[in-house]
């Protein structure tokens, strides 16, 4: 399996399975001198971890991260940062029924066909449990970006099923279990989740992630455009089936006179492009949206086949999220942070001394 790393200069490599002994990652390329403790990383891990809300899976993992290397006397050394989280609440017996059956809508069938075997306990490497290490690594990037450059990366739940938010109040996001910025929609989300639990079903969601304070100039055309790398990173999150930058697919219905973002001496007058032009950051907020599918781990019976190809039916047992989009909020933040951090380090290496006569707006 070769696809375990992301980034070029700021590079993250993860390892581990859902029901294995532990999850881990190596973070390469973090500059030396950054004050970093396990508590810095734990904040975002606690936002992502299971068992903290009645709306998500009741698997209870402490997700306590340990820094194994790369930090000395409270500061990064510039060497590889090793991070580890031990798994403590595995209930592998919940998955005994799917040992010889493929869960429809999951990676069971494709992993089995590709590798000739699979870890059926919670999906093994394909489980979203792996994203805990992405969040830990992303927390390193988030702290550096904010502390050194004033770049802040935040996300929120913007839609669940047919319920969409009408406004964004950043101060409201941490006041509810949905990471919802619109207090008037929390009750509707609550009602929807309760209904789904009774039905044994699930629902999809849309997450919006924003990077504020990103300087102009990040991105490496033509094959490492900033928007291309952002899309690649966000699309790599479990259950994501679509990524939009800026207005995304809404541009299909827009005229050029509407979509273009006029430049003025005071700055851009709109941000339909989502903060990226020609694959390079414009200095505006970088805005992306991801669509997450409804999980197939539900108690509604589904048609499938056995390892020998025989027709059968499956009801998924275990502890699962009725909407995986809720816990995807800190994951989206982490992936965007990793990409911005990587491009910042790349840009600094090649274009550090570049100056132009044009003022930055």
Swiss-Prot record:
Reported cofactor(s): FMNH2
UniProt-annotated binding residues for NADP(+): 48
Keyword hit for Lyase: yes
Pathway per the UniProt entry: Metabolic intermediate biosynthesis; chorismate biosynthesis; chorismate from D-erythrose 4-phosphate and phosphoenolpyruvate: step 7/7
GO molecular function terms noted in the UniProt entry: chorismate synthase activity; FMN binding
Comment on bound cofactor: Reduced FMN (FMNH(2)).
EC nos: 4.2.3.5
Catalyzed reaction equations: 5-O-(1-carboxyvinyl)-3-phosphoshikimate = chorismate + phosphate
Keyword Amino-acid biosynthesis (UniProt): yes
NCBIfam families, per the entry: aroC, PRK05382.1
Family to which this protein belongs: Belongs to the chorismate synthase family.
Residues annotated for FMN binding in this entry: 125-127, 238-239, 278, 293-297, 319
Name of this chain's protein: Chorismate synthase
Swiss-Prot/TrEMBL keywords: Amino-acid biosynthesis, Aromatic amino acid biosynthesis, FAD, Flavoprotein, FMN, Lyase, NADP
Complexes and interactors: Homotetramer.
Example GO BP: aromatic amino acid family biosynthetic process
Summary of the function given for this chain in its UniProt record: This reaction introduces a second double bond into the aromatic ring system.
PANTHER family per record: CHORISMATE SYNTHASE
GO cellular component entries: cytosol
